[in-house]
Amino acid sequence: MMKEIPGPPTEAQIEDGRLLFAGECEFFFGSQKIDQLPPVGRPEVAFAGRSNVGKSSIINALTGRRALARASSEPGRTKQLNFFNLADRLSLVDMPGYGFAKAAKSVKEDWQDMMFAYLRGRTTLERVILLLDARIELKASDKDVMELLDRAAVVFQIVLTKCDQVKPKALAAKIAEVEALALKHAAAYPRIIATSSETGFGIEDLRAEIARFAVPLQTSGEGQSGS
């Protein structure tokens, strides 16, 4: 059965996203091993992408903070899951970048094992935002991660980055290409979001999408720890 591609967010959903991301957002936990994860609590939305895809820039643009998620000086250097508390209503999880060519095979395998264990076993994980660079062709590592997400049975949504650097006709073609690819993956949410952390294009749309998973305001203080 063909997936139906959802429409853009409503004005009310955009406002929900604005309110959520206007709240405080603070780093509260970093984990290099799967047995060091923080206790489950708030719903989680994780961000995945190749090294240099602009993941840190997107997280900073979403939260309106310049240095919340710091980009590593060497692609793929930071191999840990970083957890951020967003307004006590949602946790944002910055996953280590993948596709780092200089890394040893054993390092890549360790990354995949840790990511699969996190994805498969994290009951509070609501969605993975998979970031792809709109300027370049999909890499084998991107397709590998999509297959990993399918196997882990975790819903993922493709978000294109650096779209301000792509001409409109080429961007439309890229969106169509990625939409077709998403329809082939069981775990893929079929709606693609095009963004630019530089211009803010698509950021309110992505905020609205993520806000769907946050604890509702009236119950945000119930059963949640401060971390």
Swiss-Prot record:
InterPro entries linked: G_ENGB_dom, GTP-bd, GTP-bd_ribosome_bio_YsxC, P-loop_NTPase
The record lists the lineage as: Bacteria, Pseudomonadati, Pseudomonadota, Alphaproteobacteria, Acetobacterales
Q: Does the keyword Phosphoprotein apply?
A: no
What is its cofactor?
Mg(2+)
The family assignment reads: Belongs to the TRAFAC class TrmE-Era-EngA-EngB-Septin-like GTPase superfamily. EngB GTPase family.
Q: Where does GTP bind?
A: 49-56, 76-80, 94-97, 161-164, 195-197
- Cystine connections: none
Q: Name one Pfam family in it.
A: MMR_HSR1
Q: Domain of life, per the record?
A: Bacteria
Keywords assigned by UniProt? Cell cycle, Cell division, GTP-binding, Magnesium, Metal-binding, Nucleotide-binding, Septation
Mind telling me what this protein is named?
Probable GTP-binding protein EngB
Q: Which residues form the EngB-type G domain?
A: 41-216
User: Which GO annotations describe the biological process of this protein?
Assistant: division septum assembly
Quote the PROSITE patterns the UniProt record gives: G_ENGB
Q: Which residues bind Mg(2+)?
A: S56, T78
Role this protein plays: Necessary for normal cell division and for the maintenance of normal septation.
Name of the gene this protein is made from = engB
Which CDD domains does the record associate with it? YihA_EngB
